[in-house]
């Protein structure tokens, strides 16, 4: 049975710039915002955009990500004529081969895509924080009779050299793609979100590999090939909140922005919910002696200290005399007495001993998942 559009989320990245936080988990599985993981935003956008069939392409440390996604029920992807499929490298007659790039990962999953029989494929990165209506992007793609549509957003020209830049004509037709140009001609940065006509993309990928011209990456290989061939390639301008949280600084910055009541993400918007897989925990408990100001405190938390402008994920335990400020504490962490944590990210299930100081002065301080720092005399 044919479908109109298949979503493919690229979620195999190692995320080396996140250091300790991706030692044992893929970047899209890194927690965010107190109750989410990064991939929840792409999955929720699919759910809200009526994209009913989604393939999640994984590779590096996929166990946490696989368990989190499960059968896709939190995103409504577990019903009739809908579903989510985890796509990992596998052994075939051609042998076993790791994904070598973004478009190579799609090429390796041609059999799955053919089974879904889509007219269009929506390619997404699984490691960005944003809300976006993919249906509106598809309508633009159809109206302009595009072969490829690339979602872009304007960035400050002085920062454009950090991105893949799309140079367009007056009708937003892309006439040139430049990967991190030293002297950018435009400030339209690619968001790594693409809509392709599947039959044409399939043809380009198969022809490239069969002729010894491998199409390994969308930015470096596929998009330039489309432009050179004179295909109808258009930019789709996005004007909402979008953050690539691939570094410690950007993850911390986006987490702190999450605490702003005027944040463009507007997580309380009932018309565009962000869904997630969450375990059921007891209610939070905040003692009479504690002080909590401008903070998100998750279910199952016990707070007997001071928490200012910070995020506590589920089941975080904060003992007496401890101060947490401008920090993101991931789930399951136990923090002892008289601890000072400022400008920091603490990984899941970490244990912070009594009288410990974790202060990010010139850069954000990071404690990894399950890391132990100091000793807790009252650890539970």
Curated annotation (Swiss-Prot):
**UniProt keyword terms in alphabetical order:** ATP-binding, Carbohydrate metabolism, Glycogen biosynthesis, Glycogen metabolism, Nucleotide-binding, Nucleotidyltransferase, Transferase
Family under the similarity heading? Belongs to the bacterial/plant glucose-1-phosphate adenylyltransferase family.
The protein's job, in short, is:
Involved in the biosynthesis of ADP-glucose, a building block required for the elongation reactions to produce glycogen. Catalyzes the reaction between ATP and alpha-D-glucose 1-phosphate (G1P) to produce pyrophosphate and ADP-Glc.
As one GO molecular function, the record gives:
ATP binding
Please report the name of this protein according to its UniProt entry.
Answer: Glucose-1-phosphate adenylyltransferase
Tell me which EC number(s) this protein carries. 2.7.7.27
Q: Which SUPFAM superfamilies match?
A: Nucleotide-diphospho-sugar transferases, Trimeric LpxA-like enzymes
Q: Tell me, which GO biological process terms does this entry list?
A: glycogen biosynthetic process
Q: What is the lineage of its organism?
A: Bacteria, Bacillati, Bacillota, Bacilli, Lactobacillales
- Which reaction equation describes what this protein catalyses? alpha-D-glucose 1-phosphate + ATP + H(+) = ADP-alpha-D-glucose + diphosphate
The cross-references to InterPro entries, in alphabetical order and at most eight, read: ADP-Glc_PPase, ADP_Glu_pyroP_CS, GlgC_bac, GlmU/GlgC-like_hexapep, NTP_transferase_dom, Nucleotide-diphossugar_trans, Trimer_LpxA-like_sf
Q: Pathway involvement?
A: Glycan biosynthesis; glycogen biosynthesis
Q: How does it assemble?
A: Homotetramer.
Look at the named UniProt entry and state the broad enzyme category this protein falls under. Answer: transferase
Q: Which CDD domains match?
A: ADP_Glucose_PP, LbH_G1P_AT_C
Protein's UniProt keywords contain Transit peptide: no
Q: Where does alpha-D-glucose 1-phosphate bind?
A: 164, 179-180, 190
Q: Which PROSITE patterns match?
A: ADP_GLC_PYROPHOSPH_1, ADP_GLC_PYROPHOSPH_2, ADP_GLC_PYROPHOSPH_3
């Amino acid at each position: 049975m044919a479908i109109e559009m298949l979503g493919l989320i690229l979620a195999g990245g190692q995320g080396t710039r996140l250091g300790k936080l991706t030692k044992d988990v893929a970047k899209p599985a890194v927690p965010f915002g107190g109750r989410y993981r990064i991939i929840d935003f792409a999955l929720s956008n699919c759910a809200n955009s009526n994209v009913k069939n989604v393939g999640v392409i994984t590779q590096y440390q996929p166990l946490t990500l696989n368990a989190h996604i499960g059968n896709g029920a939190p995103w409504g992807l577990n019903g009739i004529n809908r579903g989510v499929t985890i796509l990992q490298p596998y052994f075939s007659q051609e042998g076993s081969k790791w994904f070598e790039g973004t478009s190579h990962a799609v090429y390796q999953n041609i059999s799955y895509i053919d089974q879904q029989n889509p007219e269009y494929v929506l390619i997404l990165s699984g490691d960005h924080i944003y809300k976006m209506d993919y249906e509106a992007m598809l309508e633009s793609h159809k109206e302009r009779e595009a072969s490829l549509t690339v979602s872009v957003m304007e960035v400050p020209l002085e920062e454009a050299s950090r991105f893949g830049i799309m140079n367009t004509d007056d009708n937003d037709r892309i006439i040139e793609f430049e990967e991190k140009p030293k002297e950018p001609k435009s400030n339209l940065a690619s968001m790594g979100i693409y809509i392709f006509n599947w039959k044409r993309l399939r043809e380009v990928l198969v022809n490239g590999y069969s002729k010894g011209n491998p199409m390994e990456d969308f930015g470096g290989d596929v998009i330039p090939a489309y432009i050179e061939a004179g295909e109808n390639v258009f930019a789709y301008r996005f004007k909402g909140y979008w953050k690539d949280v691939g570094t410690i600084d950007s993850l911390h910055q986006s987490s702190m922005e999450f605490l702003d009541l005027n944040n463009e993400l507007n997580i309380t918007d009932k018309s565009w919910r962000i869904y997630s897989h969450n375990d059921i925990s007891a209610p939070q408990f905040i003692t009479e002696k504690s002080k909590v100001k401008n903070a998100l405190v998750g279910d199952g938390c016990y707070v007997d200290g001071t928490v200012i402008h910070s995020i506590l994920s589920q089941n975080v335990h904060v003992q007496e005399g401890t101060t947490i400020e401008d920090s993101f504490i991931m789930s399951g962490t136990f923090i002892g007495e008289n601890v000072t944590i400022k400008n920091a990210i603490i990984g899941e299930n970490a244990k912070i001993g009594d009288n410990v100081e974790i202060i990010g002065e010139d850069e954000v301080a990071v404690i990894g998942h399950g890391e132990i720092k100091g000793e807790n005399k009252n650890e539970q």
